[in-house]
Amino acid sequence: MSRIGKKPIPVPRGVEVTITEENRVTVKGPKGTLSQQFSPEMLITHENGVITVARPSDDKRHRALHGLTRSLIANMVTGVTEGYQRILEITGIGYRAAREGKNLVLQVGFSHPIRVTPPEGITFEVLERRSANEPQQVIIRGIDKQKVGEEAAKLRALRPPEPYKGYGIKYRDERIRRKAGKAGKAR
């Protein structure tokens, strides 16, 4: 049995879970509603405030789907109760971020500012720098873990951190492998 798949998912108070015949799971909580279609082969049950996922057989495909389905449902429950966030840091001379309404405006070394419109369910927050040599932080929040991660990856891809001075957009917990600059001329 899958170690991840066999773990039951506790449903906190204030969270409603509905499971249809076609295995569409809808989770409604204080932060919003998430709905996702799962493989009809998986056996998903909701009893006594606990969601359990079972598989019909032990073939490789069912073992893989078992843990995946359980993890995705657990992420949905966490998303509608606590939500998810990713923090990006913008480092570089003249690199900055600002909000215009819901949109995010980035100045990251291009000849023009880049405007990013958040998809539905995603919000941006820009924290002001406390000092000039501290990186500026952008927080991406939402209830769907996949959407939050995808939007963070798209923003990071606009200007990935370069290895010499570390300028660019990176995740807060990311470590950049730095390179030494070229050696000076010997006289």
Curated annotation (Swiss-Prot):
Gene: rplF
GO cellular component entries: cytosolic large ribosomal subunit
Record-linked Gene3D superfamilies: Ribosomal protein L6, alpha-beta domain (3.90.930.12)
Family: Belongs to the universal ribosomal protein uL6 family.
Lineage top rank: taxon: Bacteria
Pfam family, one: Ribosomal_L6
Subunit structure: Part of the 50S ribosomal subunit.
Keywords: Ribonucleoprotein, Ribosomal protein, RNA-binding, rRNA-binding
Protein name from the UniProt record: Large ribosomal subunit protein uL6
GO terms assigned for molecular function: rRNA binding; structural constituent of ribosome
Transmembrane segments: none
Function of the protein: This protein binds to the 23S rRNA, and is important in its secondary structure. It is located near the subunit interface in the base of the L7/L12 stalk, and near the tRNA binding site of the peptidyltransferase center.
SUPFAM superfamilies hit by this protein: Ribosomal protein L6
GO biological process: cytoplasmic translation
Organism field: Roseiflexus sp. (strain RS-1)
